[in-house]
C-alpha cells in the first residue's frame, strides 16, 4: 500500500482550479473535464462528485470547489465509482483500470494497486460497494472483494466465478446478488471456501440494500421487492423499472429514466415524475444531491407540500474543458483552441473548446444538427480569420465545413452548396452528407483559408477572402489519398501529411499565383531516402512542423525524419535525415532518434527545442538539434495522464506546454518562451524579486533575445553564475558556479545578445 499526503488549497468556484498568477517552472496544471456529473457522495461539509471520470468536491459552507487529479493527490485517472464511509471518513475511489485509492479526511491517499495488478481472465469491474463495520464489500465481475478501512488494506477476495451485481450485509450474513441468483454466506464461516456460500434463490437482483432492518432488492424492469431473510421469498413493494437503488441515512432512493421514488420508510414513498437526466441521487442532512450529468452537481430539498424537489444549489461544474477530447490543438495569440474529434472509429460529439484568460468555453453545439439536417460531430480542425478574431471555421471529418461567429453557428458548407466533394460514389443523397471529409484548416499570408478534402479529385480547396473558391488537383495525389495536416513554411510553401491507403508528404509551391496552377511546383513522396542512402518505407506519417531555422520535422511510426534543406524537396537527389544519437559507450556507434516510437505530435518551443509526443511512450523534450533528451515524461514518472499523446500546443508568450492525451488535457510550465527581437528595459526583469528565504524554486529572467549570454555578478563584480537563455528566458537556481546557495544581497544580471551588439542589465535582491 502506497500512501500520499497532499494539502490542497480550497479554490472558490469563481476562481477555479486552473487559475494561478504565475505557474512555477516545472509545474503541472490540471485541465481535465469535470462536466457530465454521474455520481455524488455526501461527506459532511463536502459533496464529492464524478464528472467525466474525474473527481471534485463542493464545500457546502464556503461554496469552494476542489478538483482532484493525478498531479495533486490521486494515484490514477478515469474514475468509474466512488463510495463514502462516514465512520472512517474515507472515500473509496475505483478507477477504470481497477486501481483503488482510499481518500481519508480529504487529504491523505492510500493506494491499493493489488487488484489492478492481479492477472485475471475476468474483467475487473466494480459494480457496487456497501459497508458494514470497518469493512467495504466490493461487488465485482468475479465475486466479492473486501477492504478493511481501519487497516487500509484488501482483507479478503471471494472468487465466486460469477458476476456480483450488489451486496448487502447484516449482523450475521452477507447477501450477494449474482448473475445466477441470490447467494448468502455466514460471516462467521470461511467465505474463501466456495462451499460456504449458498444459492438461496434464482431471482436475479440488480441492487440490494438493508433498509429499515429489511432486505430490499431491485429486479430490473419489474420493481423493488421485500426479501424475507428466512426463506428468501419476495413480495413487490413498488413496480416499474429502476436503474439504481441506494440507501443514504434514513432514505432509500430509486430512480429510472424520468422519475424518482423517495422512501421516508417502507410505508411512506414519494413518487416524483419528470426528473430527466439524473444519473445518480444521494442524500445527507435533508438535502438530496443530484448527479445531473450536463447540469452538473445540484442540491435539492424535498418540498412536502408540493411533493417535489426544489433546487437550492444549482449547476456546480468546475471551470474545465467540456470533454476530454484533444484531437487537434492550436494557439491564436493567448487563446487555445481545441478541435475535439477527428478520424476515429467511434463518432465524437461536435466539440470546439477555447481556453482564454484562464476560462474554458465551448462553441455552440445545440441546434446545429436541427438547422443543418445532419449530425454535428467529428470536428477535426479549426482556424481563426486573421482579419476578424470572432470568425472561425471548423472542419468535420465527415460532415463538411462549419462557420462560426462569436462562437455561434453561422453556416454549413457541404457538397450541395459549395465545391466540397463527397468521398465515395454513392447515389443516395441521404448518405452523401456523411462523406464530405474535411480537415487541415489553415490560413496563408494572403488570408486564404486552405483545407483538405479526403479521397476526392480536388483534394485541396481554398476559400478566398471575397468568398470565391479555388479547387486544386494534382495527378500524383489520387482519390485513395487523404491529406490531413497542412502547414505553410517561411517561404509560403504548403506541406501536408497524408494517411489512409497511401501515407506520405505532399509539398506545393504556388509561386504566389493561386489561381494559375500551370506554374506550380508539387510533389508527393511516400518513400524517403535518408542520408545513408537507406530507403525508408514509413507506413504511417502523423504530423509535420517547421522549426525556427526553417527545418521541417515529420513524425512517423518509426521516429522523426528531418528535412534540413526543404528547398531541395523538388530535386531528384533530395534526401531526408534521421538523427543519429551517439551511444557514448566507447563503440562509436549511434542509434536513430526514437526509431522505435510512433511520433504522433511535434511542437517547437521558444528555444527551438522539440516537444515530441508518442503513441505509447509519453512525451520527450529534445534539444534544438535533437541529440539531447532534456526530459522524458511518462505516465509512470510524472503526472502525465497517459502515454498516448494526441496533440501538443505551446503558448509562446508564457512557455506553457499543453499536452493532449487520450485521457484528457494537462499542461507543463516550461522554461522557454518566444525570444524578443531586441532588449526593452521594461520587458527585461527577474521574478520572483525579491527572492525570500522560503522560496525554493528557480529565479527567472525574462524578456531576452534568442541565445542571450547571461552573467550574474555580486556587487563587487565577481562572477557568480553564467549561461545562455532558452529562447527569451533564463532560469537560475540561486547557486554559484560551485553549486552553493548564494548569500543575501543584490545580484546584477548582465545580458548580451549572441552577437554582442545589444546588452541590458537588471538586478535581483535575495533575502535569507
Stretches with model-predicted labels:
Residues 648, 725-729, 766:
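A short acidic/small-residue loop/turn micro-motif
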Residues 710-720, 747:
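Short, glycine-anchored, charge-dense loop/turn motifs used at functional sites
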Residues 387, 444, 489, 694, ...:
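Surface-exposed coil/turn segments at beta-strand junctions on protein surfaces, enriched
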Residues 678-711, 729-732:
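Glycine-centered coil/turn sites that cap beta-strands in beta-rich domains
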Residues 1-27, 450, 493, 768:
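Bacterial Sec-dependent N-terminal signal peptides
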Residues 759-764:
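Edge beta-strands of extracellular beta-sandwich domains
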Residues 725-757:
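Short, surface-exposed loop/turn motifs with a glycine/proline- and acidic-biased composition
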Residues 21-684, 719:
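Carboxylate-rich, polar loop motifs that coordinate divalent cations or form catalytic acidic clusters
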Amino acid at each position: 500500500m502506497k500512501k500520499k499526503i497532499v494539502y490542497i488549497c480550497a479554490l472558490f468556484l469563481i476562481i477555479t482550479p486552473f487559475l494561478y498568477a504565475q505557474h512555477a517552472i516545472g509545474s503541472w496544471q490540471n485541465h481535465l473535464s469535470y462536466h457530465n456529473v454521474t455520481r455524488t457522495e455526501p461527506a459532511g461539509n463536502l459533496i464529492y462528485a464524478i464528472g467525466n471520470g474525474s473527481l471534485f468536491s463542493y464545500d457546502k459552507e464556503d461554496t469552494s470547489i476542489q478538483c482532484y487529479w493525478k498531479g495533486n493527490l490521486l494515484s490514477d485517472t478515469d474514475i468509474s465509482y466512488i463510495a463514502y464511509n462516514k465512520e472512517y471518513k474515507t472515500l473509496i475511489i475505483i478507477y477504470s483500470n481497477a486501481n483503488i485509492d482510499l481518500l481519508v479526511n480529504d487529504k491523505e491517499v492510500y493506494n491499493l494497486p493489488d487488484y489492478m495488478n492481479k492477472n485475471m481472465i475476468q474483467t475487473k469491474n466494480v459494480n457496487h460497494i456497501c459497508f458494514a463495520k470497518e469493512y467495504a464489500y466490493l461487488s465485482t465481475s468475479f465475486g466479492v472483494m473486501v477492504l478493511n478501512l481501519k487497516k487500509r488494506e484488501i482483507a479478503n477476495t471471494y472468487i465466486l466465478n460469477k458476476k456480483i451485481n450488489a451486496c448487502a450485509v447484516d449482523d450475521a450474513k452477507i447477501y450477494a446478488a449474482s448473475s445466477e441468483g441470490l447467494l448468502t454466506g455466514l460471516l462467521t464461516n470461511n467465505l474463501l471456501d466456495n462451499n460456504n456460500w449458498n444459492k438461496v434463490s434464482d431471482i436475479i437482483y440488480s441492487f440490494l440494500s438493508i433498509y429499515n432492518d429489511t432486505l430490499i432488492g431491485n429486479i430490473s424492469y419489474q420493481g423493488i421487492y421485500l426479501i424475507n431473510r428466512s426463506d428468501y421469498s419476495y413480495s413487490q413493494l413498488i413496480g416499474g423499472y429502476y436503474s439504481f437503488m441506494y440507501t443514504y441515512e434514513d432514505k432509500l432512493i430509486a430512480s429510472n429514466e424520468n422519475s424518482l421514488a423517495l422512501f421516508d420508510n417502507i410505508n411512506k414513498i414519494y413518487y416524483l415524475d419528470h426528473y430527466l437526466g439524473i444519473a445518480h441521487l444521494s442524500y445527507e442532512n435533508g438535502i438530496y444531491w443530484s448527479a445531473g450529468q450536463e447540469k452538473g452537481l445540484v442540491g435539492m430539498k424535498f418540498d412536502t407540500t408540493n411533493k417535489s424537489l426544489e433546487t437550492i444549489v444549482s449547476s456546480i461544474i468546475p471551470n474545465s474543458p467540456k470533454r476530454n477530447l484533444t484531437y487537434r490543438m492550436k494557439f491564436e495569440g493567448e487563446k487555445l483552441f481545441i478541435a475535439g474529434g477527428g478520424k476515429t472509429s467511434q463518432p465524437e460529439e461536435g466539440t470546439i473548446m477555447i481556453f482564454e484568460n484562464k476560462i474554458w468555453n465551448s462553441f455552440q453545439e445545440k441546434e446545429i444538427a436541427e438547422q443543418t439536417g445532419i449530425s454535428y460531430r467529428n470536428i477535426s480542425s479549426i482556424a481563426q480569420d486573421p482579419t476578424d478574431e470572432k470568425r472561425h471555421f471548423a472542419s468535420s471529418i465527415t460532415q463538411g465545413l462549419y462557420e462560426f461567429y462569436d462562437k455561434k453557428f453561422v453556416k454549413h458548407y457541404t457538397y450541395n452548396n459549395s465545391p466540397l466533394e463527397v468521398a465515395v460514389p454513392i447515389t443516395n443523397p441521404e448518405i452523401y452528407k456523411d462523406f464530405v471529409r474535411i480537415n487541415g484548416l489553415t490560413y496563408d499570408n494572403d488570408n486564404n483559408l486552405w483545407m483538405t478534402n479526403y479521397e476526392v479529385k480536388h483534394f485541396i480547396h481554398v476559400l478566398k477572402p471575397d468568398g470565391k473558391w479555388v479547387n486544386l488537383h494534382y495527378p500524383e495525389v489520387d482519390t485513395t489519398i487523404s491529406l490531413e495536416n497542412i502547414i505553410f513554411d517561411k517561404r509560403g510553401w504548403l506541406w501536408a501529411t497524408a494517411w489512409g491507403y497511401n501515407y506520405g508528404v505532399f509539398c506545393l509551391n504556388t509561386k504566389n499565383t493561386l489561381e494559375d496552377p500551370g506554374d506550380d511546383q508539387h510533389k508527393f513522396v511516400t518513400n524517403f531516402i535518408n542520408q545513408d542512402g537507406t530507403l525508408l518505407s514509413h507506413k504511417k506519417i502523423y504530423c509535420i512542423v517547421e522549426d525556427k531555422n526553417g527545418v521541417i520535422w515529420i513524425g512517423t511510426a518509426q521516429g522523426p525524419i528531418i528535412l534540413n534543406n526543404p528547398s531541395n524537396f523538388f530535386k531528384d537527389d533530395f534526401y531526408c535525415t534521421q538523427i543519429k544519437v551517439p551511444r557514448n559507450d566507447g563503440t562509436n556507434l549511434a542509434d536513430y532518434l526514437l526509431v522505435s516510437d510512433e511520433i504522433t505530435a511535434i511542437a517547437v518551443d521558444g528555444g527551438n527545442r522539440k516537444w515530441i509526443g508518442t503513441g505509447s511512450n509519453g512525451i520527450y523534450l529534445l534539444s534544438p538539434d535533437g541529440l539531447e533528451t532534456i526530459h522524458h515524461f511518462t505516465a509512470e514518472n510524472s503526472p502525465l495522464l497517459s502515454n498516448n499523446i494526441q496533440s501538443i500546443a505551446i503558448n509562446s508568450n508564457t512557455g506553457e506546454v499543453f499536452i493532449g492525451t487520450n485521457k484528457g488535457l494537462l499542461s507543463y510550465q516550461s522554461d522557454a518562451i518566444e525570444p524578443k527581437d531586441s532588449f526593452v528595459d521594461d520587458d527585461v526583469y527577474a521574478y520572483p524579486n525579491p527572492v525570500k528565504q522560503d522560496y525554493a524554486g528557480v529565479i527567472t529572467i525574462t524578456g531576452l533575445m534568442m541565445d542571450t549570454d547571461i552573467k550574474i555578478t555580486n556587487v563587487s563584480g565577481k562572477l557568480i553564475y553564467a549561461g545562455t537563455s532558452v529562447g527569451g528566458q533564463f532560469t537560475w537556481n540561486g547557486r554559484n558556479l560551485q553549486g552553493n546557495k548564494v548569500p543575501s544581497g543584490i545580484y546584477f544580471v548582465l545580458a548580451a545578445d549572441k552577437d554582442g551588439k545589444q546588452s541590458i542589465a537588471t538586478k535581483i535582491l535575495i533575502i535569507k
